[in-house]
Amino acid sequence: MLFAQRLARVRDEMRSQGVDALVVSVGFDLPFLVGYHAMPLERLTALVVTPECATLVVPRLEAPRVEHHPTVFDLVAWNETDDPVAITAGLIGAAQNVAIGDQMWARFLVELLKHLGGRQFVRSVDVVGPLRIQKDAAEIEALVAAGAAADRVAAQLQSGAIPLVGRTEAQVSADISARLLAEGHDVVNFAIVASGENAASPHHHAGARVIRHGDIVLCDFGGTMNGYCSDITRCVHIGEPPPDVARAWSDLRRAQEAGVMAGRVGATCESVDSASRQVLTEAGWGEFFIHRTGHGIGMEAHEEPYMVSGNHLPIAPGHAFSVEPGIYVAGKWGMRLEDIVVATANGPLRMNTTPRELVVL
């Protein structure tokens, strides 16, 4: 029933935008629409949606996996001697305006475009995006559960249950990953551990640096649980922080709170960014805040909507997004504070409740 409803809704969106056919491949539009996760193989898997039908094109060796999924589509299983791109083009038929999945591999897209010369193309995000961006009650429940599981790991970090001093960043990252799985995640998407001067690199890759007394340790981690993602960032300090770090954290907390409170239904996405950025700019940290304030989250860790200057999209009920301002002083230290928020008619609802202090260990 769920996937039949989603296909009906995407057809309505196609009709309203004058799109005659939709083609999605690997990525998350496919499982969102029909519940099937395609393996990222050199063999093409594609879902073709037209006003009349939905057809899933899969390599024959993948067909047994499809049998366990909802039967809301016709199935075409191609043999190794077949041309799956030609089969897909045939299903698109005479459609003139075609939406193509953002994550279709170039090796297939280039060949498909040869078959579809003279057509008009748009991105699938234009027709599937409006469905995915507003989470329903079940999706919000999944985000709550994933956020709570990530919170439990963050609590272990703050309590000192995850040893830090004397271990490498990579060792701590592996420890956090194992704990995410133990708390119910199916997949770990990332576990950033950045200590000392490495914390000034927002997406630092945990490495061989040994964590020591006097370090700030930034931990940004998340995974997928029952199809939906978690994402949280907390920092701890090994020993008492120096005055500039303590002041920066106080300012960062105020900036994050301002961003969360700005994320109300009817406000624009950029207003979240503006609220956090204004606090840090007025506190003298503006030049050290080097990224947007947030990103959407759902089946993907990063998806629409983005909390960034210039995004005038109004926030609507069911929009789920991060609020994660940061301060990064190159060669010295960095910090970030992140929670996931869902916009509701009653105001922003946080998915994360772990304390937001700079915990001293």
For each of these PLM feature ranges, what is it?
Residues M1-L361:
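Active-site neighborhoods and metal-handling regions in enzymes and metal-associated proteins
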